[in-house]
């Protein structure tokens, strides 16, 4: 019951810890984009036991949107990182790395989302 975090290499957020992520392609569903980004960023697509939406964020000007999902998998694995990330760590709930990407920090500091994560963890055996 641990979470995979990836350490970013881009100059704007270098060293910050985040999650697998990226933009969907034209006419690509959110789920297909999710599977593609997982494969691109960690080198393989583990079998998804469950995919649970955590947050659907839209900026005030409606120009920026992102979805955050929790993907439950059977077993932890050794990620094969692409150039977007320089490191990874598997962390227990609320024991995540200190230097979180600002957007992820906001997400994980949201009481409602933390409650949802805890509920899901309690249900996953």
Listing of model-derived features with the role each one plays in the protein:
Residues 19-54:
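The catalytic Nudix box helix
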């Amino acid at each position: 019951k641990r979470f995979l975090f990836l350490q970013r290499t881009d100059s704007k957020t270098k060293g910050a810890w985040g999650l697998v992520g990226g933009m969907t392609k034209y006419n690509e569903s959110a789920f297909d984009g999710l599977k593609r980004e997982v494969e691109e960023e960690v080198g393989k697509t583990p079998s998804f036991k469950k995919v649970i939406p955590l947050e659907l964020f839209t900026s005030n000007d409606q120009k920026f949107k992102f979805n955050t999902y929790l993907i439950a998998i059977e077993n932890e694995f050794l990620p094969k990182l692409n150039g977007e990330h320089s490191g990874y760590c598997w962390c227990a709930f609320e024991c995540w790395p200190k230097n979180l990407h600002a957007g992820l920090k906001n997400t994980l500091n949201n009481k409602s989302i933390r409650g949802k994560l805890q509920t899901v963890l309690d249900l996953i055996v």
